[in-house]
Amino acid sequence: MYENGISFIISLLICGCVKSEEMMKQHFVLVHGSCLGAWCWYKVKPLLEASGHRVTALDLAACGIDTRSITDISTCEQYSEPLIQLMTSLPNDEKVVLVGHSYGGLTLAIAMDKFPDKISVSVFVTSFMPDTKNSPSFVLEKFASTMTPEDWMGSELEPYVVFSAEFTKHRILQLSPIEDLELRLLLKRPGSLFLNDLSRMKNFSEKGYGSVPRAYIVSKDDHTISEEYQRWMIDNYPPNLVIEMEGTDHLPLFCKPQLLSDHLLAIADKFS
């Protein structure tokens, strides 16, 4: 009788430890920016996984190895469909850590508005972060007004986004390893800002998008979305947490993946 009681207690303790470990594990969902793909997280993904977490890196529509063409995608919601499908498939009791880079911030916002109860925190990595008072296109339109034609260094924005090699080298990846620059140039695909569509969309809601905890990671040496503009978005719609990264360009996931991974782990732990 006594031995059975001890065995029962030990079983409870073991089950409790296993359950505790499972609860500590996070599910990170990594969302790339315009003209990129899931491949751009190739340095960060294994670092998060090495810490024992589950990681999903998505190709959005017409990105990475997704077979669709950008000419067949007319709305930001269509573009974001792979993330929406993933969020729909999650069990109701599972919460993920959403991480969006650059234009991926708009995709995050769409998912946050639809699935606020399935997200523990959303992390905006030097990305566009909309508010709930203005049109979803507002942060893009204001950003565009800060750029001159010369600033784009021969890049195309209409009808589709194609960043020039010069812009990529000097404004996007100026601090990243040359191998990552070459990879970016080899794997580039045209994108879209979907400005017309976003300008017609309803504002993101406080009940949905606004109810999800947000963290913003500032890249201080970003020459694409400048630190000044990142801080304007932060002031415009303050997140719950702001973290700075020095010595990083527009792709800290390339130039300082370990530091970025450490920040993501700390944020996930804080909001778990």
Swiss-Prot record:
Coiled coil: none annotated. Gene3D superfamilies: alpha/beta hydrolase (3.40.50.1820). Keywords: Hydrolase. The gene is MES8. It is an enzyme of class 3 (hydrolase). It comes from Arabidopsis thaliana. This is Methylesterase 8. The keyword Nucleotide-binding does not apply. Methylesterase shown to have carboxylesterase activity in vitro.
